[in-house]
Amino acid sequence: MKWERKDILGMKDLSVEEIHMILDTAESFLEVSARDIKKVPTLRGKTIINFFVEASTRTRTSFEIAGKRLSADTINISASASSLVKGETLADTARNLEAMNPDVIVIRHSCAGAPHMLAGLVRQSIINAGDGAHEHPSQALLDMMTIRNRKGGLSGLNVTIVGDIAHSRVARSNIYGLNKMGVCVTVAGPATMIPRDIQQLGVKVCFSLEEAILDADVIMMLRIQTEREQQNIFPSLREYSTFYCLNRENIKKAKKDVLVMHPGPVNRGVEISPEIADGVHSVILEQVTNGVAVRMALLYLLTGASS
């Protein structure tokens, strides 16, 4: 299969074949990251702009490392260091970046749809690194890679996503992607954190953590996104953790070889207890490692290096 897509905007857009191609390509880059000299000349002469209008640690650093390991020139721009603070529109900023002739623009923005707007404005490839509560495709891809490597495949597995589903772009991207790969997805959380129409995406809904993780092969815990909430949707963090914190007792309801995942940042003692986050079931740090390989694969494919 030849890669033909210009942008990575969401898991909803990707075909099963494209997902397989990304994950297979990422596997080859895992070996690069394990070397003493973690650099290959694949993207020498290419320029990657990481334009993060919304705060990020893992994703921005991961994209920067991915570009540098492929020998690309990487430039990081934050909202506070851009002309957005002077009143320039996002569209004008994008056109100015386009005029500098980079090869890929990676964007994170608090507004859903911002990457899609840029993709229609500029000729460069756009990677959505998270847009509001909409999508976060590279996170879903690294999650799928982690599951596939640990379980030997994806089809037929039971994956439960627990937490603030309503405000989570990670949940939405994983639902789109996992459904396409034949995974049975269950979402769980308080009723105030579950969108009313979520079942239309092909998921099962539970309001009990214990019920949701019965027979689960993978449990994906999400933090409460207080920065996106317009009002209090639960009485207190203590009450939330009483019912929805994954701990050594309730995890016994899941399969013995269950994987525990978290996109980070982790709020220990709220959605997940420390002994589970650091325990034998946890693959949280493996997700981070795989994230670099997945983002290397995306940059490699979008710049045409594969051809």
Curated annotation (Swiss-Prot):
What's the domain of life for this entry? Bacteria
Give the record's family classification: Belongs to the aspartate/ornithine carbamoyltransferase superfamily. ATCase family.
Name the UniProt record assigns to this protein: Aspartate carbamoyltransferase catalytic subunit
Citing just one GO molecular function, the answer is: amino acid binding
Give the EC number. Answer: 2.1.3.2
Q: Where are the transmembrane segments?
A: none
> What is the annotated quaternary arrangement, including any partners?
Heterododecamer (2C3:3R2) of six catalytic PyrB chains organized as two trimers (C3), and six regulatory PyrI chains organized as three dimers (R2).
- Which amino acid positions bind carbamoyl phosphate, per UniProt? 58-59, 108, 136, 139, 264-265
Reaction it catalyzes: carbamoyl phosphate + L-aspartate = N-carbamoyl-L-aspartate + phosphate + H(+)
Q: In which pathway does it act?
A: Pyrimidine metabolism; UMP biosynthesis via de novo pathway; (S)-dihydroorotate from bicarbonate: step 2/3
Q: Which Gene3D superfamilies match?
A: Aspartate/ornithine carbamoyltransferase (3.40.50.1370)
Q: Where does L-aspartate bind?
A: 86, 169, 223
Identify the gene encoding this protein: pyrB
Function statement: Catalyzes the condensation of carbamoyl phosphate and aspartate to form carbamoyl aspartate and inorganic phosphate, the committed step in the de novo pyrimidine nucleotide biosynthesis pathway.
A cellular component term from Gene Ontology for this protein is: cytosol
Give the enzyme's main class according to its UniProt record, as a single word.
Answer: transferase
Establish whether keyword Phosphoprotein is in the entry: no
Keywords tagged on the record = Pyrimidine biosynthesis, Transferase
State if Transferase is listed as a keyword. yes
